[in-house]
C-alpha cells in the first residue's frame, strides 16, 4: 500500500482524446509535497507517512512544529496529512513526491472539503419533494412537513433530516481515473469532479476498490533533495537603481 499526496485544486477543464472525444477533468497541482516524518510500529503502533505541502509563515508555526520540521530538514509546511502505508512503501524523510507518483489510466480516491452553501432548506439540502402547489397549501410549499409521530413517540428523533447548514463536509470520491500527469509543472488531471472549491486542499491516494497497475512505481515516484535540505527559494529581485539628478 503506497502513500498518497496532498494537492491543491486548480479548477476544471477538458482534454481531447485521439478519437476527438472530450473528457472533463479536474486539474490538481502538487507543489513541494515532502515527507515530513515516519510513523513506525515500534514507536507509534502503526506504519504511516506524514507528508506536508505548501509553505507556511514561520510566525504561524508553533515552536514544537518548528522543531519537528528542523529534524526533518524541510521548510515549515502549510498543510499536513498522514497516509497509512506498508513497510516496503516507506519513502525517505525529506524526499519530494512528484506528480508522476500516479500513472495515466489508474484509479484514485480523492478527499476534500465540500463547498459551503450556508443555511439551506429541506428541498435543497436533502432533496425533499416539498408540499403540494395548491389544494389548501398556501405559504408552505417548500416546507419539510411533519418531523415526527403523534403522542407516540412524542418527540423528534436525533439525526432527522431537517433544514440546516449545507456543505463544508469531508467527502471522498472514489474511482476517479487519472487522465494525464505533468511532472514538470506538478499537475495531475483526473476525470470528473472533485469535492471542494478552487484552491482547496485535496488528498489523493490509490483507489482501495481497484487493483494497482503493475506499472505504478513502488514505493513511489519521488526525488531526494541533497542532504535532505529544503528546496531553494528564489531570492527577491533587486530594485533597479534610480539615478538622481544633480
Swiss-Prot record:
Location of region: Disordered: 140-162
InterPro entries cross-referenced by the UniProt entry: Ribosomal_uL3 (IPR000597), Ribosomal_uL3_bac/org-type (IPR019927), Ribosomal_uL3_CS (IPR019926), Transl_B-barrel_sf (IPR009000)
Entry keyword annotation includes RNA-binding: yes
Keywords noted in UniProt: Methylation, Ribonucleoprotein, Ribosomal protein, RNA-binding, rRNA-binding
GO CC annotations on file: cytosolic large ribosomal subunit
UniProt PTM: Methylated by PrmB.
Organism domain of life: Bacteria
Modified residues (N5-methylglutamine): 151
Entry's Gene Ontology molecular function annotations: rRNA binding; structural constituent of ribosome
GO annotation terms (biological process): translation
Family (UniProt): Belongs to the universal ribosomal protein uL3 family.
Family matches, as NCBIfam families: L3_bact
HAMAP family per the UniProt record, alphabetical: Ribosomal_uL3_B (MF_01325_B)
The protein's role, per its UniProt record: One of the primary rRNA binding proteins, it binds directly near the 3'-end of the 23S rRNA, where it nucleates assembly of the 50S subunit.
Assembly with partners or alone: Part of the 50S ribosomal subunit. Forms a cluster with proteins L14 and L19.
The name this protein goes by in its record: Large ribosomal subunit protein uL3
Upper taxonomic lineage: Bacteria, Pseudomonadati, Pseudomonadota, Alphaproteobacteria, Hyphomicrobiales
